[in-house]
Amino acid sequence: MSPQTETKASVGFKAGVKDYKLNYYTPDYETKDTDILAAFRVTPQPGVPPEEAGAAVAAESSTGTWTTVWTDGLTSLDRYKGRCYHIEPVAGEENQYIPYVAYPLDLFEEGSVTNMFTSIVGNVFGFKALRALRLEDLRIPPAYSKTFQGPPHGIQVERDKLNKYGRPLLGCTIKPKLGLSAKNYGRAVYECLRGGLDFTKDDENVNSQPFMRWRDRFLFCAEALYKAQAETGEIKGHYLNATAGTCEEMMKRAVFARELGVPIVMHDYLTGGFTANTSLAHYCRDNGLLLHIHRAMHAVIDRQKNHGMHFRVLAKALRMSGGDHVHAGTVVGKLEGERDITLGFVDLLRDDFIEKDRSRGIYFTQDWVSLPGVLPVASGGIHVWHMPALTEIFGDDSVLQFGGGTLGHPWGNAPGAVANRVALEACVQARNEGRDLAREGNEIIREASKWSPELAAACEVWKEIKFEF
């Protein structure tokens, strides 16, 4: 080989594998107002220092790769790289740390939750140096959140559309979730709405199956809600699930719902995907439809305490992508949810400005500026005895959804709906009179049941139901 063609490792640039912390651990970095900030929970492999683990997360979720590459010299890595700027140990846990990472805003496409997650969590979770990794929280700067439309309408516009104020909204998921014909499904919807509910709901896995095709369901449900509206004088809604196998089919279903004149459609935003969800949210805003969001598959992502992603991150992403309602756990029913932590992400869904509060799992102060709020939906194993606690915990700006707690009433769907509406009105009145729902809740329900045989029957059926696993 001639001297002119001889290749040496030292020629051109300094190649090889470097410790991530040399470039990506920067404890002196002062975060910018425009940075996206992330708090991870990292469990390093034995022998990996926390600084190296935190720097590896910053590198692999931004500009880094496993070796030095010559194209690094064609850009300014200092401008674009993520930086691990602080690390703290997790109290009470061995070998767990919270590294904080700052990402420059230019790393992300405007208005794309898909791109944001692809960058921040798309690749780094399989990194060998980490035994486990969890994204606990994100700080979304106004400079980025303003590139999103957010919820199609928001809380106040929804109340104005429905003409319902001063109380939580009441809903019900139609059961059995699978197997009913479209006509019988519509009958169940009608009975629930006539009895006093504001909404009924398709279950998340009701799409367009052989036993009930979507178009038939949409037609019978529209007939049911118009009939219930005429009889009660109240505006009613049914969450028609538009989720489908393709975005084109999803949009076709949403268009048909709009043509029927119904007020609201539904989407499974995690299984359907953020791109599809954002497209549907844009359509809903442009065409006056409310959008109910189900979080099917969330526990696959958020249930493990040391790996995955906390639901507060998914909730923030949903507010950006778009949805007027989203399921948020109950604290009291059959589905898991800790009270303070749940209320933390409920505030992140509803409020404009949320202060940092680690006791509620909020790692960063979040300013949503003018992004509309999302109504949290409490659903899963709840019944009339839970009504005082739910009214106190979630407040007026929420949707309380009783599936089995309505349809399981011994007298039928309509009496089940009556029982829930009477219980809710009693709790709201008691609260407005200054009574303590936490201490007097059972007494308030018993007093109301004296004037409502439907509520009395419900109280008897569910007096000893508890979910203790």
UniProtKB/Swiss-Prot annotation:
Single GO MF annotation: ribulose-bisphosphate carboxylase activity
Pfam families: RuBisCO_large, RuBisCO_large_N
Enzyme Commission code: 4.1.1.39
Cofactor(s) for this UniProt protein: Mg(2+)
Positions annotated as propeptide: 1-2
PROSITE patterns (UniProt xref): RUBISCO_LARGE
BP terms from Gene Ontology: photorespiration; reductive pentose-phosphate cycle
Processing after translation: The disulfide bond which can form in the large chain dimeric partners within the hexadecamer appears to be associated with oxidative stress and protein turnover.
Residues modified to N6-carboxylysine: 201
Gene3D superfamilies, sorted: Ribulose bisphosphate carboxylase, large subunit, C-terminal domain (3.20.20.110), RuBisCO large subunit, N-terminal domain (3.30.70.150)
Record keyword Thylakoid present: no
CDD domains named among the record's database cross-references: RuBisCO_large_I (cd08212)
Primary subcellular site in the record, as a coarse category: plastid
Positions of modified residues (N6,N6,N6-trimethyllysine): 14
Residues at which substrate binds: 123, 173, 177, 295, 327, 379
Chain sites annotated for binding Mg(2+): 201, 203-204
Other known facts: The basic functional RuBisCO is composed of a large chain homodimer in a 'head-to-tail' conformation. In form I RuBisCO this homodimer is arranged in a barrel-like tetramer with the small subunits forming a tetrameric 'cap' on each end of the 'barrel'.
The protein, known as: Ribulose bisphosphate carboxylase large chain
Originating species: Brexia madagascariensis
